[in-house]
Amino acid sequence: MKKIIFLFLVLISFKVSAQEINIIPQPAYIDKKQTQKPFIIDSKTQIVVADSTLIPSADFLNDYLQKYYKLKLTITKVTPGRNFIKLISNTRISEFNDAYNLITTDQNTTIIGTSKFGVFYAVQSFIQLLPTVANQLITVPSVVIVDHPRFDYRGMHLDVSRHFFDVAFVKQYIDYLALHKMNYFHWHLTDDHGWRIEIKKYPKLTEIGAWRNGSIIGLWPGKGNKNIRYQVMPNEIKITPNDAVIKTDGIRHGGFYTQEQIKEVLDYAAKRYITIIPEIEMPAHSMALLAAYPELGTEPNKKYTVAETWGMMNKYNNVLQASDTTFKFLENVLTEVMDLFPSPYIHIGGDEAAKVWWKQSAVSQQMMKANGLKTESELQSYFIRRMEKFVNSKGKTIIGWNEILQGGLAPNAVVMSWQGEKGGIEAARQNHKAIMTPENTMYFNHRQFVKEDSLAANKFSPLIDVYNYEPIPTELNAEQAKYIWGAQGCLWTEYITTPAKVQYQLFPRLDALSEILWSPKDKRNYPDFQKRLKTQFKRYDLMGITYSKRYLEN
């Protein structure tokens, strides 16, 4: 019997030593020890952690092993003679932030990070060395990995306004980001289509603003609706009674997160070293807010309703009044938001505001006159600067979509460039941090294929285009390029109604994004990435992720 077991282990060791190491994102350096036996994880393997700050990484690994391999390991401070996974923090191993070394032998695994973050990222690479099938011997190939991130900001966004997703799925989404070494989660909490965060001072935001009476059927403009021009251009308001009649499915949709639930999600993300950036949209995209508090609009006597169709709702006037009353309201909202979220960054939107409504508002015109503002673009800048001053007074920094450049950029603002790269380039040239998220490649709600399997936004962002995106524009010199903080994928949910559809739209484009942001530029190779994806897909099968399987056809 012993001889049979020995031969079995020898066969396993040859199989593992010969296997390819397919990690996404691609590490900076990998040395495969092809002649060495694998490290075998069994019930006697221990996770060694002497530094208490590394416990979250140990717990994450242990939870993963238990969930997918039905194996729970002992966590200890004492290093045994062999058969252990040791987590260590040592700032001297690399000049790079959040770097790590990962060394596996047949006796043990040693993970050394320059920080607790680096250790956590090493754990994610270690997980990708595990078998993609649960019911077999858990072997890890002998390897040395030396790695570090390329960009400091590695972000992913989720819109929960157009369609609401519960706490359990938001946590799952955060796990997806963690497994891909992402470190920022942009949580789009408010928009025309629903207000999703409890604000205790203003309960009607969730009593009224969190619910809509229906959603259009199919692609915009929706089944039975005319393709009306609904985006207001400067000096142009053409709206008829028929424009306001929208046919929908008549199904009430909504939901919101209580502040206690927000805290629960924040705690969950913190243990995965992901910073959550909340977005509170202003001055436009405010139909849900105005449905609850119409007095804050430029037409205070109008009956607003939470939006039931997609796209920009500025034809129906979704812009907040530029008044002291509005500013005080927003300050109170942001106070509660900032008290909840430890993030040093607060996203305040700033996009797609139809300034024509300010042009026709006596109150807004008076605000312009009182502050020496000549144009409505300057009023937008004043609006953003005023909110920035308040946010800065609380020790935090604002992020805004690239429209916040209009009329002059607020002094400390970070620009999120979605309308191509122009906004990011302009911000970097003004010595402001920029996050690149151009919609043609970074919007994962777009179709992945010319003929999609299911309903998706009528734009095309295939995997190869995502993978080949380079966040640093060639127009910038070396000094300006330092202000490109990183990039972000965005997932808008007009046509994404279930967790399975989120997964389908996200994977494998999130894999491509992670490699853009983590791996050295000279390590990126699309054919090699495609090869590594085959192993990643097997892992997704193990995890029950509904990825886009059409990529397996190629």
Which residues does each PLM region occupy?
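Flexible loop/turn segments at secondary-structure boundaries
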Residues: 56, 164-166, 192-198, 283-289, ...
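Feature activates predominantly on carbohydrate-active enzymes
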Residues: 52, 94-317, 322-327, 331, ...
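Bacterial Sec-dependent N-terminal signal peptides
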Residues: 1-22
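Flexible, acidic glycine-rich loops studded with aromatic residues
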Residues: 397-403, 408-413, 419-554
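Structural detector of well-ordered beta-strand residues that form the stable sheet scaffold
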Residues: 186-188, 277, 347, 399, ...
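Active-site neighborhood of glycoside hydrolase catalytic domains
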Residues: 289-295, 299, 307-414, 418-430
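Acidic, contiguous N-terminal accessory segments
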Residues: 16-154, 392-394, 398-401, 405, ...
